[in-house]
Amino acid sequence: VSRDGRPIALQLEDEPRPMPGREVFERVLVLDEAKNFFTFVNVDAEPVPSLLRGFSAPVILAEPLSDDDLLVLLKHDSDAFNRWEAGQRLALNRLLGAIRGEREPVLDDAFIDAMRSVLRHPQLDPAFKCLVLSLPDENLLAEQLDSVNPQRIHAVREVMQGQLAQAHTAGVEDGVGDRRRDGRRRAFTDRLDVVRPDAVLGLEQ
């Protein structure tokens, strides 16, 4: 996808250029060697790769995506799993940084704005919105740490989840729908406790 969320036509080198309206925006690449190289041509915008779309096997892909790349995927990717995964990776980076004391336990505006775009998307399923807006759980966070402090992990996660709740309260009814009509739609706002950031700052790392 492009950085403004537009799908980019995919034409491999040595392929004829497709006629207007016959472009291909997704394709399967066969990896049958230890190393495979593919060159795309006539790429009309800076791309952000959305890989393994629709893939069902449990594969962990090592890809050098930056925070800016992940924010693009979170806001615009049409593949549900890739969109969710981008949000989880962004949240994980922020949570782990705060737990390790490398950053304040405060979510940045870019992340909150990207989450807001998910919440306000008119075509996304409400249950999927709740899933995307949920931060990685405490067990996953603990697995990423060399030294585990359960109290700090819990406190940092609660603070950041509370910040998401506060930031998006105004858009919940429009984005998630009438919670009285569908209990699934309560999953995001009803379980979020707003915790003060200073509750974390006093904890030892």
Question: Predicted regions span which residues?
Answer:
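A surface-exposed beta-strand-loop module
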Residues: 22, 28-48
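Polar, glycine-rich mid-to-C-terminal structural blocks
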Residues: 1-22
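Long, ordered, helix-rich scaffold segments
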Residues: 2-3, 7, 39-185, 191, ...
